[in-house]
UniProtKB/Swiss-Prot annotation:
The keyword Protein transport applies. The keyword Protein transport applies. One of its GO terms (biological process) is protein insertion into membrane. It is a multi-pass membrane protein. It is found in: Cell inner membrane. It comes from Rickettsia peacockii (strain Rustic). Disulfide bonds: none annotated. Keywords: Cell inner membrane, Cell membrane, Chaperone, Membrane, Protein transport, Transmembrane, Transmembrane helix, Transport. This is Membrane protein insertase YidC. Required for the insertion and/or proper folding and/or complex formation of integral membrane proteins into the membrane. Involved in integration of membrane proteins that insert both dependently and independently of the Sec translocase complex, as well as at least some lipoproteins. Aids folding of multispanning membrane proteins. GO terms for molecular function: membrane insertase activity. It comes from the Bacteria. The chain crosses the membrane at residues 5-25, 334-354, 357-377, 431-451, 476-496, 522-542.
Length: 560
């Protein structure tokens, strides 16, 4: 193989080693340190008094603490919780289909919590006016309701009348998944014009999140003027506020790894929107909000506006459905598919398709890997032939190098003439490697960010494809009664990956350069330690890919 090609492959491997080495040796220890800091911070927060005020949105609305008031119970196939009738706030929401962990008695995932709790997180929509004389419902308003339960079969109708006789009506519906629709209607029975603006906000007490290097976005997010806007918590903290004036707002919200809360305003107008940070009495709070232009409601007229709140799991097919049904631009990008979006999402679709037949995402990964191998077989065959030719030409290349060692231009000219004469493409040998890089990262992304892979089992001891292999050779895979430190958690699947990688190397032509050949021999061992902390689903893919490559190499060797 030409030294330039060897150098290219070595550079690719070195780059991957640096990326994943940083993840393993730098990010992981930092995460452990952060987790300790989080534990200390939580202990301190328990001692703090209840908060008196939250972040103020650009509208001037002050989100205040809630007393014990009547609530409307939320009950659907996917959600349980309640809506506060004081201020009409969505602040109590549990995702019924998801557990916090794999333990037997694990509680369900809680998304929203009231403002006076440790993990405060809530959403609300409402009305404001630029005239203080206009009496509108506010955070202290107690709404009247025609029902105590909100379900997909039974919407809730709320009403409130101010001292001037103006009626405010709200209809709330929820579907079988995670979408609330809130329609606000104003019936102006007064003799005055009413200038009003509709707003929506999501407010969250800061919770330290797992930090990852260019792997996953968590924090404020939205689609504004058909462009995806993503800001980390640190970005907003530094800026204090990121404002967008008179923009087309498809949706704004706050995203976690698997969960999303977002506001979806009515498409009838543009909106001003903000991503905000505030420190109140030692507590950090983040808020996203929007506000509409002023709407003048004349005496005797009615005015209605509709908003939606999504609060739940970021299921790919569900976000796709809402995006199409309600024309919500880039809603699926709430899932951080990464740089290789155009590859990652089709890879997920393929895995999900086969999952529908086999009922196991691990098996689905195996099937998709076989399909990818078949699609790349012709390319791999041509690559192998080119590598063999390069290997056979190496003595002649060495002779040319010795002959023209003092004339670099003539040296390159003679080598290129040799390639042309023998019909050899010096780049062909590395094409399969280059093609596999985006596929590898796409599968990694699918395993890391999609809710469908969360707590998805394989067979045997693998209960979660998105988590590392829980076994380790250093306690004989659980036979010895102790738990090694995290950097020694080298399980059965990482070992299988390293073994198959070693066998694959044995069947491939060795680099002509002895030093490079020696480096390549150590790569399985290096990757063994680097990838032991990666999602086991990725190791299953890589091990199976290596096995298929060995079979493919055997076939090519036999028939070529």
């Amino acid at each position: 193989m030409n030294n330039n090609i060897i150098n290219l492959i070595a550079a690719i491997i070195l780059s991957l080693s640096i990326i994943f080495g940083w993840q393993y040796f730098v990010v992981k220890p930092e995460q452990k340190k952060q987790q300790q800091q989080i534990a200390v911070q939580k202990a301190e927060n328990l001692k703090k008094q209840q908060l008196k005020a939250l972040v103020e949105p650009a509208t001037g609305i002050v989100v205040q603490e809630e007393s014990q008031v009547q609530r409307i119970k939320i009950e659907s196939e996917s959600l349980t919780g309640s809506v506060s009738l004081k201020g009409l706030r969505f602040d109590d929401l549990i995702l019924k289909k998801y557990k916090q962990d794999l333990s037997k008695n694990s509680p369900e995932v809680r998304l929203f919590s009231p403002a006076n709790t440790e993990n405060a997180y809530f959403a609300e929509v409402g009305l404001v006016s630029n005239l203080s004389s206009v009496k509108l419902p506010n955070n202290d308003t107690i709404w009247n309701s025609d029902s105590e339960i909100l379900s997909p079969e039974k919407p809730v109708h709320l009403f409130w009348v101010n001292e001037d006789g103006v009626k405010f009506l709200v209809t709330i519906t929820v579907d079988e998944n995670y979408l609330f629709t809130i329609e606000q209607t104003i019936v102006n029975n007064s003799d005055k014009e009413l200038p009003v603006q509709s707003y929506g906000l999501i407010n969250r007490k800061y919770i330290a999140v797992e930090k990852a290097v260019n792997i996953l976005h968590q924090g404020p997010i939205g689609c504004i003027d058909e462009n995806l806007k993503e800001y980390s918590y640190d970005d907003i903290k530094d800026k204090k506020s990121e404002k967008f004036a008179a923009s087309k707002v498809d949706w704004i919200g706050i995203t976690d790894k698997y969960w999303l809360s977002s506001l979806i305003p009515d498409k009838s107008s543009n909106y001003s929107s903000n991503f905000n940070y505030a420190l109140k009495q030692g507590t950090e709070r983040y808020q996203v909000d929007f506000i509409s232009p002023v709407q003048i409601i004349k005496p005797g007229e009615n005015f209605s506006i509709k908003s939606r709140i999504f609060a739940g799991a970021k299921k790919v097919d569900l976000l796709d459905k809402y995006e199409k049904q309600y024309d919500i631009k880039l809603f699926d990008r709430a899932i951080d598919f990464g740089w290789f979006y155009i590859i990652t999402k089709p890879v997920f679709y393929a895995m999900n398709f086969f999952y529908g037949y086999v009922g196991n995402f691990g098996v689905s990964i195996l099937i998709v890997t076989v399909i990818i191998k078949l699609l790349m077989f012709t390319l791999a065959n041509k690559s192998y032939r080119s590598m063999k030719k390069m290997k056979n030409l190496q003595p002649e290349i060495d002779r040319i190098k010795n002959l023209y060692s003092d004339d670099k231009a003539r040296l390159n000219q003679e080598i290129m003439a040799l390639y042309k004469k023998e019909k050899v493409n010096p780049v062909a040998g590395c094409l399969p490697i280059l093609v596999q890089i985006p596929v590898f990262f796409s599968i990694y992304k699918v395993l890391y960010v999609t809710i469908e892979m969360r707590q998805a089992p394989f067979y045997g001891w693998i209960k979660d494809l998105s988590a590392p292999d829980p076994t380790t050779i250093f306690n004989l895979f659980g036979l010895l009664p102790f738990s090694p430190p995290s950097f020694l958690m080298i399980g059965a699947w990482p070992i299988l990956m390293a073994i198959t990688m070693f066998l694959q190397q044995k069947m491939s032509p060795e680099p002509a350069d002895p030093m490079q050949a020696q480096v390549m021999k150590f790569m399985p061992l290096i990757f063994l330690f680097m990838f032991s902390s990666f999602p086991v689903g990725l190791l299953i893919y890589w091990s199976w890919n290596n096995i298929l490559s060995i079979i493919q190499q055997y076939y090519i060797n036999k028939f070529n």
